[in-house]
């Protein structure tokens, strides 16, 4: 009996259970009372609409924790007020964005705009169609200054509508509730639009504002309902009797879309790993600073648990190699967390990037680009090695080689944060700033400039205070720092696309590759100037 394995396993399962409880609360949206109110209007909720629309077992939700813990003074904004995910409709891959009208009548919070932009970014990067299920009261006015004016705010959504269309990426909108003010442009800038009778409406200004502005008295249905826009203005293309009829029309549209399957990347018949995926629970240490062998985790993820390791005996603090995940050919770059001994006899800390490991990883990333093989990054990194020996050995220039290779990579990159993601190590291992097609994190992960204890020591020193481990101020700094470094804070701010169950990592990678491989690679790989 492996006591340490069992302790790790119990702790990991506890973290996953806690995540699922949080998700259940998020899935409830604005609560039962608001859901009942939607049903009384003969409407479906955002999640009910998606469930009816997509193929069975073909929905992979993303960004569920968007806005988590934010806007509490306004009653919160579960899921960022909008439900989004990857789906299949009539066996055609797509992205879905659905306003949740149970959350402040579907009003746009700052996070709502950011989440919409992220989904559109995924669509542009991967050439995937988008379905918009519109049911929104418009901008949440109390926070308009955080939603309206900046480049990556509300207006960028409509700019992206135009860019998507120009690239031949199909967009369809269903207006299933209000669609007002600036938001009215979203469905109109889609390729096709559907409006539901009596519940759907589109206008730049509602009846109350029209009366106040020009004195005209007119009902919303006449102002911007289905009859007006399908028969008079010609703005919308299809009229639907109710939500299900609108969704059926989307299904019919997708049945006729000509989406060519991309053959750019190699995939064969999938085979399951020899190791159970749940074994990961016992490998992940309860204490995030403890050591483990990352190869054991890789073997729980890849087909037949087969992993061809590249330069196995060189640069050992980063593990590189080839494998298949659900049949897809991939390259894997992973931080090795166990302490290793180099061929020169040097003891090297796990999770730290040294010159030799940086050089190895940079070359491997380049080779994967040469072969057109997608790259999976498994991040558990505390940073680059410091000290006079490392500086004289060129750690900065060698680290820069890896950053350069990752930055210029043209193949799909998918990042999984499985533990620590600290400082420049986050950058070198394809953090958010380096355009991974998708970035996920396990519930135990930490994303910050440095660890909580190190940060607390630095802060205390800057404040010219001596610290003791039982000092309340010292402990408070660590607690606050760790909270801000948590996976939940990262997900709330959309620094990551999803917090995933570690045992479901293989499925998350496969779904990401399915999306990423929709777009052919036409560019050639080229690095910039490198210091040698």
Roles of regions detected by a PLM:
Residues 1-532:
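Ligand-binding clefts of soluble mixed alpha/beta catalytic domains
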